[in-house]
Amino acid sequence: MKTTRKGLRDGELEKDTYGRLTCSECGESLKKKNDPDEVFSVRICADCGREWKELR
């Protein structure tokens, strides 16, 4: 699983005009899954199911 920064650099993710992360493949806004036991959150695309981790 890649980080959101690496996804932005590779062109897999984009930011919209309000700074929200969107999937470049399907254009959907990413959902956030927060596990309190982990150091990172997981950003998930609802349409294609791809995941990226985001350090808090």
Curated annotation (Swiss-Prot):
Function: Zinc-binding protein that binds one zinc ion. Is involved in biofilm formation, swarming and glycerol metabolism regulation.
Coiled-coil region(s): none
Disruption phenotype: Cells lacking this gene show a late onset of growth in synthetic glycerol medium, a lack of swarming during the first 3 days, and enhanced biofilm formation. In this mutant many motility and chemotaxis genes are down-regulated, and some genes encoding pilins and redox proteins are up-regulated.
Domain notes: Consists of an N-terminal alpha helix with several positively charged amino acids that is placed on top of a globular core, which is stabilized by the zinc finger.
GO molecular function, one term: zinc ion binding
Keywords annotated in UniProt: Metal-binding, Zinc, Zinc-finger
Outcome when changing C23A: Loss of structure and stability
The protein's assembly and partners: Monomer.
Positions occupied by motif C(P)XCG motif: 23-27, 45-49
InterPro entries registered for this protein in UniProt: HVO_0758-like
Impact after mutating C48A: Loss of structure and stability
Protein name: Zinc finger mu-protein HVO_0758
Binding site for Zn(2+): C23, C26, C45, C48
Keyword set includes Zinc: yes
Top-level taxon in the UniProt lineage: Archaea
